[in-house]
């Protein structure tokens, strides 16, 4: 369960949507991602997430909704099979686990500076924090692989599959060799109200500052 929560925290970043400025057939995966980062400042959508161990064992699938607003604001709400909420207000990242009655608080730079969140929610150049390479097309998507330059990032690589200038699937291999796949759907670009990224810990919960 602890490892599942860590994966969910790492992937709270994967709320995405994009509007194409050029046809997808003319753009590489890198160009499509660059277009997404440059043109989509906010979006909402849904996700489904599954995790497989190096031995092939599967963890319970997760599903929920997300929202983001650049730079660095996002909301990742797991609804099934248990509730979990991860919210960044651009300065701090709050992870709330209702069943544990606990809120974990991290500074946003600490939480997403060199994580996959920086790819989709940040505003910097991808090549500054990641070594990026192209992958063969697969499952109707164009793919790229990003490997963190920081050895302490907590994951070894993240593959991003794109279609029509929209990230559609993310596959992350973490430090334990687990592969977490996130499927994105119902992507709706547009400004998201600031209230979506405000979080106040409920009374009675433990608040742990990292």
From Swiss-Prot:
Gene3D superfamilies (alphabetical): Lipoprotein localisation LolA/LolB/LppX
Family: Belongs to the LolA family.
Protein name according to UniProt: Outer-membrane lipoprotein carrier protein
InterPro entries: LolA/LolB/LppX, OM_lipoprot_carrier_LolA-like, OM_lipoprot_carrier_LolA_Pbac
Chief location of this protein within or outside the cell: periplasm
Gene Ontology BP term (one): lipoprotein localization to outer membrane
Subcellular location: Periplasm
The species this protein was found in: Bordetella bronchiseptica (strain ATCC BAA-588 / NCTC 13252 / RB50)
Keywords: Chaperone, Periplasm, Protein transport, Signal, Transport
Assembly notes: Monomer.
Function recorded in the entry: Participates in the translocation of lipoproteins from the inner membrane to the outer membrane. Only forms a complex with a lipoprotein if the residue after the N-terminal Cys is not an aspartate (The Asp acts as a targeting signal to indicate that the lipoprotein should stay in the inner membrane).
Signal peptide per UniProt: 1-26
Highest taxon, organism lineage: Bacteria
GO cellular component, one term: outer membrane-bounded periplasmic space
Record has Protein transport as a keyword: yes
């Amino acid at each position: 369960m602890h490892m599942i929560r860590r994966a969910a925290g790492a992937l709270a970043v994967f709320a995405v949507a994009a509007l194409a400025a050029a046809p997808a057939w003319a753009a590489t995966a890198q160009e499509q991602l660059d277009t997404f980062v440059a043109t989509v400042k906010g979006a909402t959508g849904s996700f489904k997430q599954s995790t497989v161990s190096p031995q092939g064992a599967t963890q319970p699938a997760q599903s929920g909704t997300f929202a983001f607003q650049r730079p660095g604001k996002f909301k990742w709400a797991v609804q099934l099979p248990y509730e979990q909420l991860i919210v960044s207000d651009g300065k701090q990242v709050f992870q709330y686990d209702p069943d544990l009655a606990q809120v974990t608080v991290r500074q946003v730079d600490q939480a997403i500076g060199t994580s996959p969140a920086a790819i989709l929610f940040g505003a910097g150049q991808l090549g500054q924090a990641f070594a990026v390479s192209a992958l063969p097309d697969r499952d109707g998507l164009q793919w790229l692989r990003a490997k963190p330059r920081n050895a302490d990032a907590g994951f070894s690589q993240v593959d991003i599959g794109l279609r029509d200038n929209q990230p559609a699937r993310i596959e992350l291999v973490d430090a334990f060799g687990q592969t977490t796949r996130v499927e994105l759907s119902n992507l709706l670009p547009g400004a998201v109200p600031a209230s979506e990224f405000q979080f106040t810990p409920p009374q009675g919960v433990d608040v742990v500052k990292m």
